[in-house]
């Protein structure tokens, strides 16, 4: 994909190939962790998430130097059927924040993984950027990334909450077990 991107002068194609490459890298990272730990059915999601956050931040570090990422993650073991979609969701939401939230200004992206009640957890990705449009509606959005977030949330029977509060906030509430 990187070679294909370098061979085209079309910026839109380059961006699409870059986004596809980020999604593939998200999956590759997960598989590296599985093989390294000799686990094939579950993994410590917080470790994967921390590695994924670093990978995504690294891919934007040359062009978005003024953006800081903070993470607050509890330890949580997840099966692959839940970990893979949540990893892809994180990739999409962080990438969207890097690309659209700050318009060249300084900013903070936060990724939080927390326990709400007994077997219910929350993954939250937020930023302190310009926020979503006042009339934002996910059902009429033309963002492929947010469509992917909605589809993957539905796939794991998670509740997706989107709102503005000094920036864009995305909460994915999911059950384990």
Language model segments and positions:
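C-terminal beta-strand of the catalytic ATP-binding
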Residues: 172-177
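Glycine-rich ATP-binding loops of the HATPase_c
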Residues: 156-163
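Glycine-rich/acidic phosphate-handling loop/turn and adjacent ATP-lid/helix
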Residues: 120-146
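Conserved short strand/loop->alpha-helix "switch" segment adjacent to the catalytic nucleotide/phosphoryl-transfer site
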Residues: 43, 61-94, 98-108
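Glycine-rich nucleotide-binding loop
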Residues: 108, 131, 165-171
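Histidine phosphotransfer helical core of two-component systems
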Residues: 1-29, 34-43, 47
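Short beta-strand/loop element within the Bergerat-fold HATPase_c
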Residues: 106-119
